Structures are given as structure tokens and as C-alpha cells.
Amino acid sequence: VVLEPSAGTGLMAILAQIAGGSLILNELAETRADLLSSLFPANPVTRFDAAQIDDHLASGAVPSVVLMNPPFSVMANVTGRMADAAYRHVASALNRLAPGGRLVAITGANFGPDVPAWRDAFTRLQERGRVTFTAAVDGAVYAPHGTSIDTRLTVIDKLPVED
């Protein structure tokens, strides 16, 4: 079972579906949620704020994989930038993830365990899982999709952390 908490237009969800995953789709924005409902008619689309996805999904919705590209600095119902928006989304999705599951996140390039401003946040995340991979990704990779923002790919396995 694959959860995409901020599913957007389904670019990652379709890959999970092609790979055989059953989908849990969530998208707060009405237009994108309607598009997802059209593209994935067999899957209900919820419209929760993904920063609190763990609090809102049905108790039986427990994914073994989370694929996410959360907002980098935008929060629902908040005016202005929120520096910890990506962290809130990742933390809530990690809470929802099944033990032994894997979370894969595309975030802003500066959201990483080696960045001093995020070290404490990643220490807290590692109480629930271990970061098994993280790497910056040059924004040019995304040019075909209309953006060139530098990002980071981070993989967190929900396994006990080794001391």
C-alpha cells in the first residue's frame, strides 16, 4: 500500500500504480484533487492537510510505502513562509507509515540531516526511523516539468535506529 500525502497531479502515484502498489491518495487543493479522482477512478482521494495526515486518515489506512513531494515552505491556512513545512509533512507521514516501511521524500535541497539548521529535527525523526539515503538533486533534472528548483531525495526506513 502506497500513500502519497500531497499527490498533486499524480506523477508519482502513477509510477507506484504501474509497479503494482495499491494507492492511498490525498491532495488538499480542490482542482488537483478533482484531477486525481479522474485519473485514478478506482481510488478515493481525500482532501486533508498533509501536515497532519496521520491524524486524519482512517485507522486502517497504513501504508508500507510513502512517496512524497511536500510543500517546501507553505502550510495550509497560514500566510507567509513556514520554514518547517516539509518537516511537518515528513513527520506526520512517518508516523502513519507501517513498521518496516519506507518513506521517500523529495524536499528542498536544504532540508537534510547534514544541514545544521535541521540536525535536531532529523534527530527527532530518527527516534522513529533511520535515514538510509539522502542526496541533493540538481534542479535541472526537473526542467521538463517546468521547474528548476534544487531538491533533495531522502529515504527513511521505519526501523529501530542503531546506536
Predicted regions and their residues:
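Short, surface-exposed, charge-dense and proline/glycine-enriched linear segments
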Residues: 33-38, 79, 135-140, 163
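C-terminal lobe and adjacent flexible extensions of AdoMet/dcAdoMet transferase-like proteins
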Residues: 156-161
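Conserved S-adenosyl-L-methionine
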Residues: 1-77, 86-88, 95, 100, ...
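Conserved Class I SAM-dependent methyltransferase catalytic core
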Residues: 80-155
